[in-house]
Amino acid sequence: MSLLSKIAMWAELLGSGEAKQRMLIGRQLAWRVRELESINEFADVEFSVFSQFGDDGIIQWLIHRLPGLSETFVEFGVGCYQEANTRFLLVNNNWRGLVLDSSRRKVHAISRDTISLLHDLQSVCAVVTAENIDQLMLDRGFEGDIGLLHIDIDGNDYWVWRG
Protein backbone atom coordinates (compact mmCIF):
# COMPACT_ATOMS: atom_id res chain seq x y z
CA MET A 1 0.00 0.00 0.00
CA SER A 2 1.43 3.35 -1.03
CA LEU A 3 1.95 6.17 1.43
CA LEU A 4 -0.76 8.18 -0.30
CA SER A 5 -3.24 5.28 0.03
CA LYS A 6 -2.44 4.95 3.74
CA ILE A 7 -2.97 8.67 4.28
CA ALA A 8 -6.27 8.53 2.39
CA MET A 9 -7.41 5.55 4.49
CA TRP A 10 -6.58 7.31 7.77
CA ALA A 11 -8.23 10.52 6.61
CA GLU A 12 -11.42 8.59 5.82
CA LEU A 13 -11.38 6.83 9.20
CA LEU A 14 -10.80 10.06 11.10
CA GLY A 15 -13.46 11.87 9.08
CA SER A 16 -15.92 9.07 9.78
CA GLY A 17 -15.26 9.34 13.52
CA GLU A 18 -15.76 13.09 13.43
CA ALA A 19 -19.05 12.70 11.56
CA LYS A 20 -20.31 10.20 14.14
CA GLN A 21 -19.38 12.54 16.99
CA ARG A 22 -21.13 15.45 15.29
CA MET A 23 -24.28 13.35 14.86
CA LEU A 24 -24.25 12.14 18.47
CA ILE A 25 -23.82 15.67 19.78
CA GLY A 26 -26.48 16.91 17.36
CA ARG A 27 -28.96 14.30 18.58
CA GLN A 28 -28.38 15.32 22.19
CA LEU A 29 -28.88 18.97 21.30
CA ALA A 30 -32.04 18.12 19.33
CA TRP A 31 -33.51 16.39 22.39
CA ARG A 32 -32.68 19.40 24.55
CA VAL A 33 -34.20 21.84 22.05
CA ARG A 34 -37.42 19.88 21.54
CA GLU A 35 -38.12 20.01 25.30
CA LEU A 36 -38.13 23.82 25.40
CA GLU A 37 -41.72 25.05 25.50
CA SER A 38 -40.86 28.64 24.67
CA ILE A 39 -37.84 30.71 23.73
CA ASN A 40 -36.98 34.40 23.83
CA GLU A 41 -35.21 34.35 20.48
CA PHE A 42 -34.04 31.82 17.91
CA ALA A 43 -30.50 32.09 19.28
CA ASP A 44 -31.78 30.12 22.31
CA VAL A 45 -32.11 26.99 20.16
CA GLU A 46 -29.41 27.46 17.52
CA PHE A 47 -26.95 24.68 16.85
CA SER A 48 -25.24 23.46 13.73
CA VAL A 49 -24.46 19.91 12.68
CA PHE A 50 -24.70 20.33 8.91
CA SER A 51 -26.19 23.81 8.54
CA GLN A 52 -23.99 26.81 7.89
CA PHE A 53 -25.20 28.69 10.93
CA GLY A 54 -27.55 27.57 13.75
CA ASP A 55 -30.37 26.50 11.47
CA ASP A 56 -30.31 22.81 12.47
CA GLY A 57 -31.40 23.75 15.98
CA ILE A 58 -34.02 26.25 14.84
CA ILE A 59 -35.53 23.69 12.46
CA GLN A 60 -35.60 21.03 15.20
CA TRP A 61 -37.40 23.41 17.56
CA LEU A 62 -39.92 24.47 14.91
CA ILE A 63 -40.85 20.98 13.70
CA HIS A 64 -41.74 19.98 17.25
CA ARG A 65 -43.91 23.09 17.68
CA LEU A 66 -45.89 22.87 14.44
CA PRO A 67 -48.40 20.01 14.57
CA GLY A 68 -49.31 17.99 11.51
CA LEU A 69 -46.25 18.74 9.40
CA SER A 70 -45.65 16.44 6.48
CA GLU A 71 -42.29 14.74 7.07
CA THR A 72 -40.98 15.79 3.68
CA PHE A 73 -38.64 18.51 2.53
CA VAL A 74 -37.46 20.10 -0.68
CA GLU A 75 -34.25 22.14 -0.81
CA PHE A 76 -32.73 23.88 -3.84
CA GLY A 77 -29.25 25.26 -4.26
CA VAL A 78 -27.64 22.55 -2.12
CA GLY A 79 -24.22 22.28 -3.75
CA CYS A 80 -22.76 18.89 -2.74
CA TYR A 81 -25.22 18.68 0.20
CA GLN A 82 -22.47 18.54 2.82
CA GLU A 83 -23.49 21.85 4.40
CA ALA A 84 -27.27 22.07 4.10
CA ASN A 85 -30.25 22.99 6.25
CA THR A 86 -32.15 19.76 5.61
CA ARG A 87 -29.35 17.19 5.98
CA PHE A 88 -29.76 16.87 9.77
CA LEU A 89 -33.53 16.62 9.30
CA LEU A 90 -32.96 13.71 6.90
CA VAL A 91 -30.49 11.85 9.11
CA ASN A 92 -31.85 12.64 12.58
CA ASN A 93 -35.60 12.65 11.90
CA ASN A 94 -35.68 10.33 8.89
CA TRP A 95 -37.69 12.72 6.74
CA ARG A 96 -38.07 12.09 3.00
CA GLY A 97 -36.35 14.65 0.81
CA LEU A 98 -35.75 16.09 -2.60
CA VAL A 99 -32.65 18.21 -3.21
CA LEU A 100 -31.94 20.13 -6.40
CA ASP A 101 -28.87 21.86 -7.75
CA SER A 102 -27.93 23.16 -11.19
CA SER A 103 -24.51 21.45 -11.16
CA ARG A 104 -24.48 17.96 -12.67
CA ARG A 105 -21.17 17.23 -10.91
CA LYS A 106 -22.56 18.17 -7.49
CA VAL A 107 -25.78 16.20 -7.94
CA HIS A 108 -23.71 13.18 -9.02
CA ALA A 109 -21.67 13.54 -5.80
CA ILE A 110 -24.89 13.56 -3.75
CA SER A 111 -26.20 10.44 -5.48
CA ARG A 112 -22.92 8.63 -4.71
CA ASP A 113 -22.88 9.74 -1.05
CA THR A 114 -23.94 6.99 1.37
CA ILE A 115 -26.63 9.34 2.68
CA SER A 116 -28.56 8.69 -0.55
CA LEU A 117 -28.35 4.94 0.00
CA LEU A 118 -29.30 4.99 3.67
CA HIS A 119 -32.12 7.54 3.51
CA ASP A 120 -35.07 8.44 1.30
CA LEU A 121 -33.30 11.21 -0.59
CA GLN A 122 -33.68 12.09 -4.25
CA SER A 123 -31.20 14.42 -5.93
CA VAL A 124 -31.95 16.16 -9.21
CA CYS A 125 -29.89 18.34 -11.51
CA ALA A 126 -32.08 21.23 -12.61
CA VAL A 127 -32.18 24.98 -12.91
CA VAL A 128 -35.15 25.77 -10.69
CA THR A 129 -37.53 28.51 -11.79
CA ALA A 130 -40.96 29.70 -10.76
CA GLU A 131 -42.30 28.06 -13.92
CA ASN A 132 -40.84 24.57 -13.39
CA ILE A 133 -40.68 23.99 -9.63
CA ASP A 134 -44.13 22.44 -9.30
CA GLN A 135 -43.47 19.97 -12.11
CA LEU A 136 -40.01 19.08 -10.78
CA MET A 137 -41.57 18.16 -7.44
CA LEU A 138 -44.56 16.32 -8.95
CA ASP A 139 -42.29 14.26 -11.22
CA ARG A 140 -40.52 12.92 -8.12
CA GLY A 141 -43.64 12.22 -6.06
CA PHE A 142 -43.64 15.37 -3.95
CA GLU A 143 -47.17 16.72 -4.02
CA GLY A 144 -49.48 18.25 -1.46
CA ASP A 145 -48.06 19.70 1.71
CA ILE A 146 -44.28 19.86 2.07
CA GLY A 147 -43.04 20.00 5.65
CA LEU A 148 -40.07 22.27 4.83
CA LEU A 149 -39.21 24.15 1.68
CA HIS A 150 -35.72 25.67 1.67
CA ILE A 151 -34.74 27.91 -1.22
CA ASP A 152 -31.16 29.15 -1.64
CA ILE A 153 -30.71 30.23 -5.23
CA ASP A 154 -29.18 33.66 -4.77
CA GLY A 155 -31.43 36.38 -6.04
CA ASN A 156 -34.43 34.40 -7.26
CA ASP A 157 -35.64 32.92 -3.97
CA TYR A 158 -38.78 35.05 -3.72
CA TRP A 159 -39.88 34.43 -7.31
CA VAL A 160 -39.50 30.66 -7.05
CA TRP A 161 -41.38 30.64 -3.73
CA ARG A 162 -44.21 32.63 -5.35
CA GLY A 163 -44.35 30.08 -8.18
Locations of regions flagged by a protein language model:
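Membrane-proximal basic amphipathic "stem/tether" segments
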Residues: 1-43
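A short, conserved alpha-helix within the catalytic core of class I
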Residues: 155-163
